[in-house]
Regions:
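Cys/His-clustered metal-coordination modules, chiefly Zn-binding fingers
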Residues: 196-292
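Interaction interfaces in information-processing and related assembly proteins
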Residues: 1-228
């Protein structure tokens, strides 16, 4: 099953919903960053959320950034997404290993206590930025809390990544259910009742259920209406020219030191780990264009 996001409404527009399957996307991230199982699960959950939240944005140029910064061994997780289903991300310490907690990967322990920041760049003078504390550091609950506190939108977020025995991704995905301001009390009660039928996202995905079927469990008795589907993938738009800007940003003195060393340098993109080499001649050319 290729990765995709489903968008839907229910209860005559009182509810909007998103669901996604993201196995290939999360596996691509794992391959790019060579992440440990717990790092894959943490990054995969945030990537899945980023893909769905990105699809909420209206314009082609809109960009979303999600940052989780905790005091656990992972350090931090950064994800960016556009409105077209393209998402990328990285974790500060990809090789962290932790013992399981209650038979599951200990994402909360790996992330630790900290903050979630959501930045939306929608082409306005200033990007929108909202920040909340991590309530469980398991990602889904933290986003539920963020939506309620920072955006005043009562929501339910479910995210999951299941690893295979060979440490590749067996399945991944998630859902976001949001109440509109005019949602009736009985609609909310019905969704709360329906949520009892969802054990975990990965339980349903590993049985072969689709995002549409997961939404049907959650909203099928509330007039579920699928409005659109869109593909989603791990995609990094880095290039040698873009990474060059990072080299320029270190300043003339640092670049001159690199030239004096007489060695080629290698710079890696944070988001996809692609390495770009710059020869001494290229560094001299960069130095000429450096302002400071």
């Amino acid at each position: 099953m290729n990765d995709y996001i489903v968008r839907a409404t229910a209860a005559d527009g009182q509810v909007r919903a998103f669901a996604a399957t993201t196995k290939e996307l999360v596996e691509a991230a794992r391959e790019h960053h060579n992440t440990s199982p717990v790092a894959t699960a943490a990054l995969g959950r945030l990537l899945t959320a980023g893909a769905m939240m990105g699809s909420m944005m209206k314009n082609d140029t809109d960009m979303l950034t999600l940052q989780v910064r905790g005091d656990g061994p992972l350090g931090g997780i950064t994800v960016t997404a556009d409105s077209k289903g393209d998402v990328k991300g990285y974790v500060n310490h990809p090789d962290v290993m932790l013992p399981p907690k209650n038979g599951k990967l200990d994402v909360g322990g790996a992330v630790g206590i900290g903050l979630l920041q959501v930045i939306k760049d929608m082409g306005l003078k200033e990007p929108y930025s909202g920040q909340t504390i991590l309530v469980s550091s398991e990602i889904a609950e933290d986003l539920t809390y963020y939506f309620a506190v920072s955006e005043q939108v009562p929501s339910v977020v479910g995210l999951g990544v299941l690893m295979d025995k060979d440490n590749t991704v067996a399945c991944a995905g998630g859902f976001i259910i949001q109440m509109m301001p005019f949602a009736k009390e009985e609609t909310i009660s019905q969704i709360e009742e329906n949520l009892k039928n969802i054990t975990s996202v990965t339980d349903h995905l590993k049985k072969g259920e689709t995002p549409e079927q997961i939404l049907k469990i959650l909203l099928g008795n509330l007039g579920l209406e699928i409005t659109s589907t869109m593909p989603t993938k791990f995609y990094c738009n880095c290039s040698k020219e873009r990474v060059e800007k990072a080299v320029i940003s270190v300043g003339k003195k640092e670049i001159q030191d690199m030239i004096d060393d007489g060695q080629d340098i290698e710079v890696k993109c944070h988001f996809c780990n692609t390495a770009y080499k710059y020869s001494v001649e290229e560094l001299k050319d960069i130095l000429k264009r450096c302002k400071r």
